Amino acid sequence: SGPWMCYPGQAFQVPALPGCRPLLKLQCNGSQVPEAVLRDCCQQLADISEWPRCGALYSMLDSMYKEHGVSEGQAGTGAFPSCRREVVKLTAASITAVCRLPIVVDASGDGAYVCKDVAAYPDA
């Protein structure tokens, strides 16, 4: 496996990680996340191999914004009415850490838990 195996629709379903959407909304609002929601999200993420996990989270965040008529590079809060964008991005980027699922950060095979590309989602 490797980064070339990470195409949306191939490495993960599109829309990506439907089970993680409620987790993201609850977490960025500072709400308590029910165990079942956490379990669903982490299971969906665990079903995706290490390389594409961040891509799947990026795709999920992207589609949540786009469904509310926001394109990359534009500010929009429709998807997350009471969350600041920085919080949304960092929360999404940390879902792998919340689930304790490793990701591959670079080609050297270094593993970590936070998806930097998701945290850097270009929306502002």
From Swiss-Prot:
Endosperm. Keywords: Alpha-amylase inhibitor, Disulfide bond, Secreted. GO terms for cellular component: extracellular region. Disulfide bonds join C20-C41, C28-C83, C42-C99, C54-C115. One of its GO terms (molecular function) is serine-type endopeptidase inhibitor activity. The keyword Secreted applies. Its main location: secreted. It holds the Pfam family Tryp_alpha_amyl. It is found in: Secreted. The disulfide bonds are essential for the inhibitor activity. Homodimer. Belongs to the protease inhibitor I6 (cereal trypsin/alpha-amylase inhibitor) family. Alpha-amylase inhibitor. This is Alpha-amylase inhibitor 0.53. It comes from Triticum aestivum.
